[in-house]
Each structure stands twice: as C-alpha cells, then as structure tokens.
Amino acid sequence: MRGTTENTDLFDPKTQMDPDFTRHGSSSDGDFGFAFNDSNFSDRLLRIEIMGGPSDSRSEVEGCTSIADWARHRKRRREDIKKESGVTISDIVACPEEQILTDEQPDMDGCPGGENPDDEGGEAMVEEALSGDEEETSSEPNWGMDCSTVVRVKELHISSPILAAKSPFFYKLFSNGMRESEQRHVTLRINASEEAALMELLNFMYSNAVSVTTAPALLDVLMAADKFEVASCMRYCSRLLRNMPMTPESALLYLELPSSVLMAKAVQPLTDAAKQFLAARYKDITKFHEEVMSLPLAGIEAILSSDELQIASEDAVYDFILKWARAQYPCLEERREILGSRLALSIRFPFMTCRKLKKVLTCSDFEHEIASKLVLEALFFKAEAPHRQRSLASEESASLNRRLIERAYKYRPVKVVEFELPRPQCVVYLDLKREECGGLFPSGRVYSQAFHLGGQGFFLSAHCNMDQQSSFHCFGLFLGMQEKGSVSFGVDYEFSARSKPAEDFISKYKGNYTFTGGKAVGYRNLFGVPWTSFIAEDSQYFINGILHLRAELTIKRSTDP
C-alpha cells in the first residue's frame, strides 16, 4: 500500500538529536512494536531486495548452530566474495556512507523512474551492490554482487522518526535535504544471508528486543546493527551474548569484534568479558600448555594481561612468550615485529631477575634498541625506593599498561645486594603482603625467587607451622639451597624483620649451617608469638600492610675463624 504518500512527513529534519545516539535498548526507550509494519503509523515504504548468489545459501546460514559454525561460514563467505570481485566484507563495512546517494552520485534521470524528479513514485536507492544489468548504465559502487540477482522482495511500512532516532544511518538518509529524503519509497538491497538479521534489527528499533536466542543469530544481528549504525542494538546483543556460557572459541571470536565493526565501543564490554574468561580459564598456563601454545595472538595477550596469572615468576612469562613467538612466527623479522610492538607489553620486565634481564640484552628475537630500552626501564624501577615504586605502580594501575603491577607469582620477587669483599656475602629483602600471609594458614608456604651466592642458588620460604612445643600455629622462615650436584659449604646467616614503632630491621635469629643440595635451615616460629598475634590488625610486624623480611648470608671460608 501507498496510503501514506499523501501524508505530511512525520519526521522533521530540523529536529536536533543526541549526536552520540546513546540509547541502550531498554524498556525506558518505549515500546513501539505495535507500529511495526503498520501503515497507520508509518510515513514511508521500505522495499528490501534480497539478492541471491553463489555465496548466499540460506540453508547454510540457518545451519549455524554454534559459534564455530558461524565463524567458519563468515570466513567462507568473505573468501567467496573476495574471489568473485576482489572486495571483502570489511570493505563494505568500512564505507557505509557510500550506501546513501549524494550529489556526486549519477543523475537520477539515468535510473529507472528518474525522468520526473518530482514524482513521489521514484525510489531512493540505498544499495549494497548493483546487479550486472545495471552496471553498464551506472557508476554506483560495486561491492561484489555482480553475479547476484534479486530472488525475493519484501516491503515494510516504516516510521522515519523511529528509525532515525535509533540510527544515524537512517537519520542522515531522511534528513539530508535531498530528494531521497522527501520520497516515500526507500530501497535496501541485501544478501540473502542478511535477511533474518535485518528483520530482527528493524523489529528491535521498534520494540527494543529481539526474538533470537542463539549466539550465531545474535552475532548476525549485531553485525547488521553495526552496518546500519544502531549502537543500542549492538549493546543489547552484546549483553545477551555476555550472559551466555562462554567457550574458548567464542571468547576468541569476541576478541576479534573490535577490528571487525565500526562501532567498537558498543562491543567493548563483551570483549572485556572474553578477556576475563580466557584469563581465568588459563591462569595456570602450565596445566594447559599445549592448548595455550595453539592460541592466537589476541588470546595470548588476554591471558598475560592478568594480574592473577599463576606462574612461577616473570622470568617464566618471558620464557613462555619467546617459546610461543618462535612457534607461531618462524620468520625472524615477523617475530621481532610482534615481540616489539605487541608481546613486549605483556612482559613485566621490572619484576624479572637481573640475571634474566642480562639475557634479554643478548636475545636476537628482540631488536637491540627495544631490548635496551626495556631493560633500562626495568633497572631504573628496581633502583627506586619502595614507596616510590608503589607510587609509580598506583599511577599505572588505572591505565591499560600494567607493566609496573606485580603479579601473584608462585615465587615471590626478592631484592638482592651482593658483596665480594672482604668475603662473599649478600643481603636479601623479601616483602609479603598481609593477604599473602593470611592465605598461608593453616599449613601453607610461599617461596622466594632464587638468588645466587658463591655460584650456588638459594631461596627463602615462609611457612605457617604448628609450634611443636606450644601446639599453636605460628609464622616460620627458612633458607634453602637449590639442589645442584654434591657441593657443600658453610654459610653464616641472619634473619631480621622490620617492626613498629621504630620500623627498623631487628635481628630475630642468626646461626651457621653447612649446606648440601636440597637442604634448608630456619625457624618454625620466627617471631615467638602465636599466629593470631602475628596476623592481627595491630600486629607490630605489618607496616602499611607489608611484612618486611631480610636475610644476610656470608660464605664461610676455611681460613675464617
């Protein structure tokens, strides 16, 4: 019907709208579902021409029952279109403004029904492509549908104010002051695979809801919403997808959305949820080593961006990234590019050991200039006073770059000062947060990263023990030597801790021990108090929530008294 042809246009082009179109598809937007495709509440007729072609099988589209099916079909369709015309779907998505006829487009006199510019029966063509018959008489953009034909036509009564309120695309179409904005017939040309999604999108613009419930169907609607600039529908679909059970396959697909759509901000919450899912699933990468090694770059970045990564140390993160990069990018130049521009941001160099930082400087996988810059930044951070380090970390915690934020390492970082004269000696500082100590109860333990003295590796370990004499839990500290050969030698050691009110290091225990590989020595109750007193809010050993421990080691020589 064309009963609305004689009516006054319901849409006033001069009406000012929110430029960001920030509606959220909620009930507060009002439900105009009753007006959908009803001539009584419409001022225009939308003609949808559905194109058929070698890449558009409806049965194939409807057969997508999973995210993996959807991704495979979308990839296959993109490749088919590229073969047919050399133009990809991303080219179409990137140029939505070309779908609207402007002054630079061919004169309408050369188009069907264009002899009389004032004839309201003329159509404002808003097309994705032209058929082969029209190509010789028009210079419209060709988007890879030369072999397609119109296999079906749908006509819907639409309300321009409703569509324009939801979509900048339709707003521009209906208010550009040109002839097509005054006409009552508007034609869209779409692929057969897009038909269901477009109908859902149009229905959403009236009712703020969609009827589809599967992830593949919601993704189709989301992509259609992006093409026609309906941000509220993109947010709505993103929210529904976010509430569905996620899988590694779906999470990886969601990570790609920002680079596949124009309105990336609308899908950011979904992308963030995908990152959180992957980070939580693979937080202990040693348990899923083969699976993680096969993940794409975006998945690796999501996992390694987490503060909760359960890994021995940042040295282990560095080693894993090198192994993954060498497997995924055999070409050295490509690997250097990916490491320097992307993956280096996932390595928290300030928390690597100095021994490993030395290896970074000589690693051929990194450009030398980049490696030098990263190592220098790490060393400067290590040289800062603790309060300054905390200040720098807090400043960076609000940013996307979290290289100065310490992870929950299995082996806690230590600071080491070494002396060679008058005898081999080192002073080791280990800081533990109150929460870390609290997590040790009733029988846990936490280890420090290894440090070296006299060519041998040592470590500290903090325990929650049962005091054998008094039968209560207490805090213990031990010094161990890494198992390496049968070497044994004597070490003088002293354990100290800062305590209130002076907050100076106070010696707790000292002794000497002849170490052999794998042995450890220490004190089951370092502070001589029950666990409850040690961990209490008014404990004298926690300063601003941090327990500061120090161990001094000196190698005994045979000539020493």
Swiss-Prot record:
Pathway field: Protein modification; protein ubiquitination
GO cellular component, one term: nucleus
Region (Disordered): 1-29, 103-122
InterPro entries assigned: BACK, BTB/POZ_dom, POB1-like, SKP1/BTB/POZ_sf
Comp. bias intervals (Basic and acidic residues): 11-23
SMART domains assigned: BACK, BTB
GO molecular function: protein heterodimerization activity; protein homodimerization activity
Alphabetic keyword roster: Ubl conjugation pathway
Annotated BACK domain residues: 268-360
Pfam families the record matches: BACK, BTB
Taxonomy, superkingdom: Eukaryota
SUPFAM superfamilies xrefs: POZ domain, TRAF domain-like
Signal sequence segment: none
Domain BTB: residue ranges: 145-214
Any one biological process term the GO annotation gives: protein ubiquitination
Keyword presence, Ion transport: no
Record has Secreted as a keyword: no
CDD domains noted in UniProt: BTB_POZ_ZBTB_KLHL-like
Domain comment as written in the entry: The BTB/POZ domain mediates the interaction with some component of ubiquitin ligase complexes.
Role of this protein: May act as a substrate-specific adapter of an E3 ubiquitin-protein ligase complex (CUL3-RBX1-BTB) which mediates the ubiquitination and subsequent proteasomal degradation of target proteins.
Cross-referenced PANTHER family: BTB_POZ DOMAIN-CONTAINING PROTEIN POB1, OS02G0260700 PROTEIN
Protein name: BTB/POZ domain-containing protein POB1
Lineage, uppermost ranks: Eukaryota, Viridiplantae, Streptophyta, Embryophyta, Tracheophyta
